């Protein structure tokens, strides 16, 4: 792979690798909680604490494929930097959701809502990239610079709760 191609995806790859480490952390928490209360073997049922850790992990795993598709679609079709920034924000929010779910379930709600907003932003970026492709193919008009400017300007607004 040449340097330019790698430069176009390196931030997305970094965010993806960080998300893999986070998944490992979540799985370790489930395993640790299972072994703490069930001895040496892993069991899917147990104490309330284990049920919370297991459910929080399962909820994060369920949303993970959608996150990866939106991250890479937005980064490849629109702009890498805002997509990677939104991806990092999503990982922080997912951590907040996971930790919040271990306490009161209402503590996980802000992370869940914020995560949905970030996924929607990544979806909008992907859609803008697809529309730009068709504008180029059909009309010869390239709006890529405008789209990159708008997404780069809007992405810091994701920090507002």
Curated annotation (Swiss-Prot):
Required for leukotriene biosynthesis by ALOX5 (5-lipoxygenase). Anchors ALOX5 to the membrane. Binds arachidonic acid, and could play an essential role in the transfer of arachidonic acid to ALOX5. Binds to MK-886, a compound that blocks the biosynthesis of leukotrienes. One of its GO terms (cellular component) is endoplasmic reticulum membrane. The gene is ALOX5AP. One of its GO terms (biological process) is leukotriene biosynthetic process. The chain crosses the membrane at residues 9-30, 53-77, 81-102, 116-128. Residues 108-115 dip into the membrane without crossing it. Coiled coil: none annotated. The keyword Phosphoprotein does not apply. This is Arachidonate 5-lipoxygenase-activating protein. It is found in: Nucleus membrane; Endoplasmic reticulum membrane. Residues 1-8, 78-80, 129-161 are lumenal. InterPro entries: 5_LipOase_AP, FLAP/GST2/LTC4S_CS, MAPEG, MAPEG-like_dom_sf, Membr-assoc_MAPEG. The C-terminal part after residue 140 is mostly disordered. Keywords: Endoplasmic reticulum, Leukotriene biosynthesis, Membrane, Nucleus, Transmembrane, Transmembrane helix. One of its GO terms (molecular function) is enzyme activator activity. Residues 31-52, 103-107 are cytoplasmic. Belongs to the MAPEG family. Homotrimer. Interacts with LTC4S and ALOX5. The keyword Secreted does not apply. It is a multi-pass membrane protein. It comes from the Eukaryota. Its main location: nucleus.
């Amino acid at each position: 792979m040449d340097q330019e191609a790698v430069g176009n995806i390196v931030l997305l790859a970094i965010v993806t690798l960080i998300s893999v480490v986070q998944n490992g952390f979540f799985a370790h928490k489930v395993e640790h909680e299972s072994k703490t209360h069930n001895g040496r073997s892993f069991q899917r049922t147990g104490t309330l604490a284990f049920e919370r850790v297991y459910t929080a992990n399962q909820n994060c795993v369920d949303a993970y494929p959608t996150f990866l598709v939106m991250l890479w679609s937005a980064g490849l079709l629109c702009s890498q930097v805002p997509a990677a920034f939104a991806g990092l924000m999503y990982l922080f929010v997912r951590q907040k959701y996971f930790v919040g779910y271990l306490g009161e379930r209402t503590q996980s709600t802000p992370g869940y809502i914020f995560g949905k907003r970030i996924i929607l932003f990544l979806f909008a970026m992907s859609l803008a990239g697809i529309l730009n492709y068709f504008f180029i193919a059909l009309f010869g008009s390239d709006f890529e610079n405008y789209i990159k400017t708008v997404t780069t300007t809007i992405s810091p607004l994701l920090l507002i709760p």
